[in-house]
């Protein structure tokens, strides 16, 4: 069992210096509630939510829609210990997302967390290839 109040206090302590100048904002709600009400775009999104493969897929897809080009998407618990079946593990949805969106990814780091940088040059390369033909 997890003591979420301790986890939240640690998060608040670790991010407190960024809250002073409004560089970070914590949203305390389900990701589905957040995506239904959010209208902003972000340079950095850190996803550490429901670890079921289906919800991870939804969270990644929704996060990608609001991630600025050149922004970073960080996905926690790549190989979640609770799910021994890879199809149920977050890694399954993360791997599928990477394969399906590789042309929009300029940098990728995988360990316990996955760090994806969204490509800012996708449209430039497309336009350049049309002009040069």
PLM features: what roles do these ranges have?
Residues 1-133:
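S-adenosylmethionine/decaboxylated-SAM
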């Amino acid at each position: 069992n997890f003591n979420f109040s301790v986890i939240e206090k640690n998060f608040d302590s670790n991010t407190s210096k960024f809250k002073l100048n409004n560089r970070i904002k914590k949203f305390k709600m389900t990701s589905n509630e957040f995506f239904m009400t959010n209208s902003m775009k972000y340079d950095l999104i850190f996803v550490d939510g429901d670890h079921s493969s289906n919800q991870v897929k939804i969270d990644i897809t929704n996060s990608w829609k609001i991630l600025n080009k050149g922004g970073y998407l960080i996905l926690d618990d790549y190989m979640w210990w609770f799910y021994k079946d890879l199809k149920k593990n977050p890694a399954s949805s993360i791997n599928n997302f990477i394969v399906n969106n590789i042309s929009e990814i300029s940098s990728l780091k995988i360990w316990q967390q996955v760090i994806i940088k969204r490509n800012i040059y996708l449209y430039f390369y497309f336009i350049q290839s049309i002009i040069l033909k």
